[in-house]
Amino acid sequence: FGYIKPDVQANKANSPFVIASGKQAALAPYFSQFLLNADQWDGYNGERKALMQHLRSNNIKNVVALTGDIHSFFAGTVNDDFDSVGGGTPTMVDLVTAGMSSDSFFSYLRDAVGSLSTDLATLVYYPISIPTGTPLGTLNITFNLLDYTMGQTAPTLDLLADQARVQVRGALAQAGAPEAQLDVLTEQMLAGLKASPSFNTNLLGLAQQLSGLNSNPWLKYARTDAQGFAVVTLTPGNLSCQFKQVNRLVGNNA
C-alpha cells in the first residue's frame, strides 16, 4: 500500500492501479477539484492569513467571529495558515448561524451535484423512501451526507435518526398530514427507519466512513441542511452560543 497510495495521489485516474481496477471512469470524478463556494474564508486565503497573523503578532486573544449568510450552522476554529502542515494553529473561533427562511447550503449542492456527476452524489446525499402505510403514500427524502463529508463527528443510529427528524416531518406536512398528527407520525416514521437495514446498516456505515475521512479537523460542528438562528450569551468571563433549528418552511409557515 505504501507504493500504491503515492502513485494514485500523483497520477489520479491515470494511475495504473486505478486503470487495473476496471473502475477508471467511475472513479475519475473523485479526483476532480470543485470550487464549491468562494464567498467564504476559502475565497480569501491571503486576507485570512494577514488577519490571523495580526491577531497572533499582537497577542490578541479570545476573538470570536459571529457570522451567517451561508445557510448552515458551523462551529470551529480559524487557523493562521491552512496551507501549512496540519492546517496551522487555531487563532480564533468561528460561529456561523443558519437563516430562518432561506434554502439550505445542502439543498443548493444537492441540486447541483447531479449535473456534475451522479457518482459524486454519495458524498452529498442518500435517497430514502419511507412507506407510511397510510393514504399519505411513500415519503421520498434525500438524507444529508454533506455534513459527514465535511467532517461532522461520526453518528450513532439515534443521532442519524434525529438528523432526519425535521426532513421527515416536513415531508409528512407536504404530503398532507394533519398538523395535530405530525409529531406522532414523525416518531413512527423514524422508528421504522431505525429498524430498516438500509438505514441502520447501509446509511449509518456510509455516514461513519465519510466522517472518518476527517476532511476538516478544525470544523467541530456542521449542519448544512437547516433553518434556524443562534442565541449568543456574552458575560465578562464567558461566551456561549446555542444553535436553534426550526422546522422547515411549508408554504409560508414554519
Predicted features along the sequence, with ranges:
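Long, structured stretches of catalytic cores involved in phosphate-ester chemistry, encompassing
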Residues: 1-254
